[in-house]
């Protein structure tokens, strides 16, 4: 059998690999705080209580929604920057789901992870970092917003270091 025939048959048998997701059910990275609140109210998987589940993070000036889950979901965390969802964290119920089953399903759907170690498996695209972590947690992160936040934090640290050095120089 010619090698070209083998190549085409093995390619046909391989399932199509999708990019890592930017959404879970009706909640997607980039949604506004109000859109996420509305989606949480409408989805029975979340036990969203309204504003008592919303916090303001004073150091970063960001909002965080934290709510209990039901069924397979223990808790959900939704972090915003400039009014847009950029981190979605789902803590899964280890009594109902296991790490191996989730990893196997994700690998079948999204291909081999770009990073894999005992603590996490990470799938990435240009815009999304999707990870399965231990304990049983799934994270969706908007990479562009996150990297901008990290760069801002590094710039702030540089300013603080410079201010510190100038203060010390006054003595």
Predicted feature descriptions by range:
Residues 1-5:
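Hydrophobic h-region of N-terminal signal peptides that target proteins for export
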Residues 6-53, 89-171:
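Non-cytosolic coordination micro-motifs
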Residues 54-97:
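Mid-chain, structured segments of secreted extracytoplasmic proteins
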């Amino acid at each position: 059998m010619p090698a070209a025939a083998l190549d085409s048959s093995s390619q046909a048998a391989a399932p199509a690999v999708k990019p890592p997701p930017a959404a879970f059910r009706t909640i997607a990275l980039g949604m506004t705080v109000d859109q996420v609140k509305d989606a949480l109210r409408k989805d029975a998987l979340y036990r969203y209580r309204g504003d008592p589940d919303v916090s303001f993070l004073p150091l970063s000036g960001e909002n965080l929604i934290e709510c209990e889950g039901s069924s397979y979901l223990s808790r959900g965390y939704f972090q915003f920057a400039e009014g847009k969802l950029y981190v979605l964290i789902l803590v899964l119920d280890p009594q109902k789901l296991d790490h191996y089953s989730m990893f196997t399903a994700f690998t079948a759907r999204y291909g081999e992870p770009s990073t894999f170690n005992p603590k996490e498996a990470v799938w990435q695209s240009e815009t999304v970092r999707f990870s399965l972590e231990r304990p049983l947690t799934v994270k969706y992160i908007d990479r562009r917003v996150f990297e901008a936040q990290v760069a801002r934090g590094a710039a702030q640290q540089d300013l603080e270091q410079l201010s510190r050095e100038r203060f010390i120089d006054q003595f």
